[in-house]
Amino acid sequence: MEISSFTQTVDAEFAPKSTYLNTATCGLLPRRTVEGGVKALVDENAAGAVPGGGSFEVVDRARARFAGLVGVGPDRVAIGSSVAVHVGLIAASLAQGAEVLVPEGEFSSAVGPFAARGDLRMRYVPLDGMAEAVRPTTSLVALSSVQSADGRLADLDAVRAAAAAHGARVLLDATQSAGWLPLDAGAYDYTVTGGFKFLLCPRGTSFLTVTEEAQETLRPLYAGMMAAEDRWGSVYGPVERLAGTARRFDAAPAFLAYHGAEHSLALLAEIGIDAVHAHNTALAARFRTGLAGIGHEPVPGRTAIVAVPGLGSREPALARAGITVSDRAGNLRAAFHLYNTQADVDHALEVLAD
């Protein structure tokens, strides 16, 4: 997308009233999502209009939109309400004693369901040593593409190669990258993604992708009508026939969130992930350069999330200046997305320089 078209499209959808650099916590909702999705369903519900409570067709359109963004078919996508729901499904399907390899400091939703079982062998290693740590006894490697605490990018090619060499499966949490970093979800056995950050969806949207081969390893824990081949024919009694696709792993959707998600995902498809990636990483690079110029050393990398170790205590002062960032693990964390500008970067640098 041309720069002028990019700017016009973004300006038509967003009007932040502060310097919002906190998409790694929660993304802003586009105007079309609020008005054409969420508010429209709320109004229908209030009036008792059909479909009122929500539409399976809308959920399936959101599924297809997400699939298009991550390079798989809709038949490889299951929906839910949180990353932990999907990770819990995978954790429940592992054999007793299976070895799970995760990075130290990984976000809790990606590791907690495995650790909570109590009968799995958990191994924690530094992020930059993940590939070397895979061994023949490893059953699953679980990691985020971009770390929540500091924005570091994992060496995903090396991890996949090591896992393949030792017969281990890979679970990728793309919550902090989907929406700005190009992703080929089909290259992983499983991916999980929360929709409320860089995908700009309302909270309550999440997506699981699973390859056709890896699908056979999972148990359909949420086998209600959403997981049935014939939804409306499976309202009562046990589901006689599960969907043959990844939809068999669907959890009950928060319809209000998915009615909005359809529009948010359509916006990202219109703009293009490559264009968003170029925009976001350029702003992040400007911020890193500016930080170095005022005596701060950010975590290096070409990522849309910038973290400065030991500077998290400045978050309240930035908030008073109208700048929204996060304090994560002692890091000052700023995240850049399509609605941010160079003026946002410069405003944050000006306050930090005082």
Predicted stretch roles:
Residues 1-354:
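Pyridoxal 5′-phosphate
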